[in-house]
Amino acid sequence: MAINSKFKMLVLSHDGAHDGQLQKIYDLNQANTPEVGSLESKKHLTKLLELSAYNLLILKGDEVIGFIICMREGSDYGSENYKFFSKKLKKFLYVDRVAIDKKYRREGLGKAIYDDIFNEAKIENLPIALEVNTEPVNQPSLNFHEKMGFDQIGAKEFADHSVAYFIK
């Protein structure tokens, strides 16, 4: 589906990424740490995709320039942040990670991804759940999610970082 004349989105099945796409997703993820959690390896990314329920790629031509990975309730995902929502919500769509290449930010791509996620969640009337780092602070993400209508429902401090939990 086209976002505009320059970019398109592609729904990615959990086993649908080819090796070049996996490498680019991994590289984008690592380039966006600590805003998104670091991945140990491309194998770790593959495991996340296997656990995931809904994923999108943003492409410019054939180049992957952004992605989002989402989980549903009932997953075996071991993330403490995911577990927070599992304890609070019966059904949900959890945004595990989203990243856009720095060169393509402020072009409406984040909004386009979330608009698609909102439409997907609407099918089953699911709340969308996510966390944002508050230490170190990810102010652009906090601002973005506030603007998109997310409400904070909790927070947690870890040994090396802190997060705020949001739903919409």
Segments and roles (model prediction):
Residues 135-154:
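Conserved active-site alpha-helix within GNAT-family acetyltransferase domains
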Residues 100, 106-119, 147:
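Conserved acetyl-CoA-binding loop-helix of GNAT-fold acetyltransferases
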Residues 69-97:
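Conserved acyl-donor/pantetheine-binding loop and adjacent beta-alpha core of acyl/acetyltransferases
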Residues 2-43, 63-65:
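Short amphipathic alpha-helix that is part of the acyltransferase structural core
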Residues 54-72:
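Conserved beta-hairpin
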Residues 6, 155-168:
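C-terminal "cap" of GNAT-fold acetyltransferases
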Residues 96-106, 134-135:
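A short, internal acetyl-CoA/4′-phosphopantetheine-binding micro-motif in the GNAT/acyltransferase core
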Residues 121-134:
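Conserved GNAT acetyl-CoA-binding A-motif
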